[in-house]
Amino acid sequence: MESMGEGPLGWVDPRVARLIDANLDRSREGLRVVEDWCRFGLERDDLVVQLKDWRQRLGRLHRSTYKQARSTATDPGAGLSHPAQLERDNPQAVVAANCGRVQEALRVLEEYGRSVDPSLASESAAIRYGLYDLEVSCLNASVANARRQTLNNCQLCLITTPCPDLIERVSQALTAGVTMVQYRCKSGNDRERLDDAKALRMLCQTHGALFVINDRIDLALAVDADGVHLGQDDLPTDVARGLIGEARLLGRSTHTLDDVRRADTEACDYLGLGPVHTTAVKPDKPAVGPVRLQEAQAITRLPVFAIGGIDLDNIAALLDVGCRRIAVIGAIMAAENPERASQQLLQALLPPVD
């Protein structure tokens, strides 16, 4: 008896019925793997609804004629595997592999279904084209999710300053455990900045750290940075978000509580608040102090990095008001030993032991 709502089929070559059955199984299983990641990993209801609909549509077309042709015991491909299947070491790799698996299976259904089951062929084609776009959305969301998880766990952001041994100093900081680097360079030319940004991007990838670029959206896109950090006078958040996309991080410098409130309603991922102490980098900006930092943290849902003149001698006052994220320049970049300086700052940021 055929599935409900399906008309009878004519005679189908058992070999064709068997491969249609196998590829329907393949498609539905692969869609479920992707669906569960979108549900539990990304919490994206929109993607889950679409994937579930595709599974149900294919299920309605999985006729008993195809299932009865199944013969797993005599399948020469049963149990075969490839070394590449063992290399899926993160959710994005699993999603990409299963999307590819489903797309291939749907193409098989489309080709062999044309002569025996036109409705199956047309549905397979429609789902295959839809999956091409959904795969991009899912992978972008997965990358964004991973970046934001790293951001949420980040306590120490290193902001660079030009120096002859830039790469070595950043490398030492990353080795010590710094998980976010912001490339800031107001001197030199764009070719030099591009070379630096490429090298720092690769270095951060090696250490599993975030790499964001100060001000320059074009440079961030050119090196595929994890995000961009903008000041109050830079592009509006909605314009910047439109340029960098949803997957990249967008940080915003803030100096007042009004700045914080405004950023909290926009598509920002994190804030820098400062300067908390007087600093030579921005001598025209008055220090906001620990109390203002505490007030800012209380009115925003976003991670807030205290910035400005922070070092081991004054960090205690920030910790006393609940600060657990800082961004520094000189405390690491000007240190005699950047690795040790980074370790000491990270140690200071550890939550107190009861």
What would you call each of these model-derived segments?
Residues 2-25, 29-144:
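Structural preference for solvent-exposed beta-strand-turn elements
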Residues 15-18, 125, 129-172, 238, ...:
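N-terminal amphipathic alpha-helix/helix-capping segment at the start of soluble metabolic enzymes
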Residues 91, 152-167, 248-254, 306:
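Active-site mouth loops of central-metabolism enzymes
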Residues 170-176, 202-206, 221, 241-244, ...:
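Acidic (Asp/Glu)-rich catalytic clusters
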Residues 179, 184-186, 232-240, 272-284, ...:
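Glycine-rich phosphate-binding active-site loops on the catalytic face of alpha/beta enzymes
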Residues 193-215, 232-255, 284-312, 345-354:
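Alpha-helix-loop-beta-strand connector modules within alpha/beta enzyme cores
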Residues 211-226, 255-267, 299-306, 310-328, ...:
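Catalytic cores of alpha/beta
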Residues 253-283:
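Histidine/lysine/aspartate-rich catalytic loop segments that bind and position anionic ligands
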